[in-house]
């Protein structure tokens, strides 16, 4: 047998294309059609299907027009930074297209009134409030394998408490239990997520590493597995308040695309999240319009095509809210200049010390 195989390798007259064809047909007989293919010549390859985040600026910063389907997404940040709001807005955008969405509420903290204000159709939203981390991830796996769900949100990784920890005593030390649970679950989930074309969004919290002298002491919960399996990682931060006279009516928010397997990462975008409303679309039109040179700013005045929008940003936002046709026209112009705006985002947010964990695993 060893002599025959040696002759086969050394025989220069063997037609490699026929040998490859035979090998490919054998693989397809064993594992099914489509189990191996040529990347460039396959006619069934389709464009990346995406779902909007509800923020025009973030959709542009992501490079593909939104969050990609059939992928794992991680949204992380400090408390009250807008993580759940961003996930709920993505659900609302998916439902507008007729998508079926699910919300695994491990924190038992979903506010249905707020979700409705963001545009979520509660009648058609599947919700689960599991008791343990194993139960949450089993429900996630079952829904993904069904192939019927478009967007599934797990809120949050930190709340996925292993059964052994819940059943144990309060002071028991169980190191690495949650990290092992996440690692095992993601190994199972990743193939079925791709086949079912389901987007799975994991919301995560931030913890501080003790004794860090250099670099950022921040890290996310649940071990390192999610950092590797996620195709997109978004770092969301509250950077200020939106005020109307003395009353705080929203948060100024910054989102950094820390990891992106679909397009160049490290783009950074800022927008307002208004209380009871979500992402301020008119605020984005003003800010992105100025950045792209579509909206002119002269002193405190904003204008578009020689038409004045208002004095001051809030007045310009109000004018666009009252004139939806003009707002749509500016949005269309912004989408046509998406490449230019994306380049500006890249200039604003290169990799820094805070991205140490993320940049290493791309």
From Swiss-Prot:
Keyword Methyltransferase listed: no
UniProt keyword DNA damage, yes or no: yes
Localization of this protein: Cytoplasm
GO MF annotations, alphabetized: ATP binding; ATP hydrolysis activity; ATP-dependent DNA damage sensor activity; damaged DNA binding; single-stranded DNA binding
GO biological process: DNA recombination; DNA repair; SOS response
Domain of life: Bacteria
GO cellular component terms given for this protein: cytosol
Residues binding ATP: 77-84
Keywords (A to Z) from UniProt: ATP-binding, Cytoplasm, DNA damage, DNA recombination, DNA repair, DNA-binding, Nucleotide-binding, SOS response
Family to which this protein belongs: Belongs to the RecA family.
Function: Can catalyze the hydrolysis of ATP in the presence of single-stranded DNA, the ATP-dependent uptake of single-stranded DNA by duplex DNA, and the ATP-dependent hybridization of homologous single-stranded DNAs. It interacts with LexA causing its activation and leading to its autocatalytic cleavage.
UniProt xrefs under PANTHER family: MITOCHONDRIAL DNA REPAIR PROTEIN RECA HOMOLOG-RELATED, RECA
Protein name: Protein RecA
Species for this entry: Rhizobium etli (strain CIAT 652)
